[in-house]
Amino acid sequence: MGNNQSIIERLVSWDESISFEAKRVSGKMVRKALETIVAFANTKGGILVLGMEDYSKAKGTDRLIGIQENAEAVDELQQKIQHKIIPPIPIDDVLWKKLNCILHDGNSGEIVIISVPMSPKVHSIVEDGTWKRLEKGNREMTAAEINELCFSRGVISAESELVDVPFELLNTDSWRSYCENRGINSGDIKDRMFRIGLARKKDNLILPTKAAVLCFAEDPSGILSSKDSVRVFHYAGTRIEHGAVPNLLKKPKTISGPLIKQITNAYEYVINEIAKGLTIATSGFETVHRYPTRVIREAITNAVIHRDYHITRDVHIRIFDNRIEVESPGLFPGNITTETIAYAGSFSRNPLIVNCLREFPEPPNIDAGEGVRMMFAAMQAQGLYPPFYSSRRDSVVIFLLNEERPPVWEQVSEWINRNGFITNGQLCRIATVDTLKASKMLRKWVELEMLEVDMSKGKKNARYRKAGSEADGNVIGLLSGLSDNKKSPLL
């Protein structure tokens, strides 16, 4: 009961947000709750509490109305979750938990917590549309928004689109090397690509897929009138300086060609740039780049292979004195997030491209879903910080830091993963340091863009969370308290 009380105290203090909503089980609750559940699944996940008044109408324990107000509505919602959502949200993915509590009138009662994960799919309600979550409330999505979300989640991929490109433009050295390695000898290029799924019929014509153009054309960007190359920027110092004289060490390098060559050439170019010996950092100290080469290769490979080719933008690699950044167009596919990337299973946005590149004589470093884990292990073995991922509006950036990792970081990282944020006082207790030392540590992590600070509650109450984090810190902490008590929807 003590743990329940702690959870309830947190719940009643929360206002509605992109990841949280509370509802009384009366009136039109079932329809609105179903919309919220679908909206959470289609956005970032979230928590819906039944039997609790809205924050704008009551405060504290006065919000605890209880589900006995309309218990039948809760049963109806359970049924509709299973039968009115398409495609269905797996029943085991939705966590339901009843909590006993003292209601606003002093009587004993129950509320229900429903935890909905971010889904790898895009869900709709039968005869009630497709919904997304806003900062407060839900909104029905337009057809264009649904299409964009399908591309973003990897439900559909631009690689499978048919393009009106002559097959002779794909009959390159890369194509011949690929065919020789696979033992594909019979038929012309059109027939061969059709047989292996890299071309399909449309109106009695056989056309190549975008994947075929990306994998074999000498200049995919030119042929597709798109931006499907890799660009490398090498900066002096630790940040981009905007001004009359940019702090680029040299002209940006554009690397184009078939994807297999983009990966190889970009990797070799970056390795050559960081292997030129010592560089003078802006601090005046000499620095040596210590990144494991396997990690750099994997970061580039992932950016090229798993990017969203629906977005017209190149992959950007930025080299600084203290880090390498690789920015890949498109968000994480499926339900992978910055919080789960280190241990999430593989989810390929572009299976045609992945399968194609595996069949080259010297395939890129595709480790059957283990590449990200390898990166974390290799950076740890080198004594460096683990890779950091940040989600931006329509891209994902991986940061490889050329910085020695202090032992306390593992505890700090785990604390933030469980609670969503950390404060100066909490770091003092974890690291057994004074306030000044904790402030210096936090300030450095912010400068390295590993953490970002929230001062909305004042400087003394500053909270730090991982940069580019996609989850609501409040929800993270609550979910960690519920995860050991998971119950099915059939309460």
Segments and roles (model prediction):
Residues 1-292, 300-404, 417, 423-428, ...:
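Conserved N-terminal catalytic/coupling substructures associated with nucleotide/phosphate chemistry
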Residues 295:
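Conserved N-box helix within the HATPase_c
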Residues 408-412:
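Short alpha-helical "packing" element that flanks the helix-turn-helix/winged-helix DNA-binding module
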Residues 441, 450, 471-491:
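Extended alpha-helical interface modules used as scaffolds for assembling large macromolecular complexes
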Residues 456-479:
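Short, cationic-aromatic polyanion-contact patches
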